[in-house]
Amino acid sequence: MKTSRLPIAIQQAVMRRLREKLAQANLKLGRNYPEPKLSYTQRGTSAGTAWLESYEIRLNPVLLLENSEAFIEEVVPHELAHLLVWKHFGRVAPHGKEWKWMMENVLGVPARRTHQFELQSVRRNTFPYRCKCQEHQLTVRRHNRVVRGEAVYRCVHCGEQLVAK
């Protein structure tokens, strides 16, 4: 577990939350699911990811440091729910009805698919694109896909194709 820049108090708070929610789930489900492996290796704008086959949760240390309380309250149970759903139901839609049920009825946490953390410190170079209603910032990866003709992106609000400025 690479955790060199994270204060021990934050790491302990993450483990407390993980263990608390896992115990709650095991009690409500009548199971004894094991504690998942935890690492602080997630990069980019994702707060965390759940790796099903390796039964591992990867958390973003930068976003954790910048948003400790909300991160621990929301992201840790969010990723744990993915692992529990996989153990309990098998392969299902990532944020489907089983995940929502696990979040709300078992873990007692609002089922939100995305975080609302400020991303300036973790966002790499972006490229400005426009539609008819607003400006968008595309990541290097998405920009390169557009340049190579491999992808077309549309605005989720107006539906218009995004065009480089």
Swiss-Prot record:
The keyword Zinc is annotated on this UniProt entry: yes
GO biological process: response to stress
Origin: domain of life: Bacteria
Domain SprT-like, first and last residues per copy: 20-163
Residues at the catalytic site: E79
Binding site residues for Zn(2+): H78, H82
One GO cellular component, as annotated: cytoplasm
Places the protein is found: Cytoplasm
GO MF annotations, alphabetized: zinc ion binding
Gene3D superfamilies, per database record: Metalloproteases ('zincins'), catalytic domain
Alphabetized UniProt keyword annotations: Cytoplasm, Metal-binding, Zinc
Note describing how the cofactor binds: Binds 1 zinc ion.
Transmembrane segments: none
InterPro entries assigned: SprT-like_domain, SprT_Zn_ribbon, Uncharacterised_SprT
Cofactor(s) the protein requires to work: Zn(2+)
HAMAP family, alphabetized: SprT
Family per record: Belongs to the SprT family.
Function: Involved in bolA gene expression at the stationary phase.
The protein, known as: Protein SprT
Source species: Escherichia coli (strain K12)
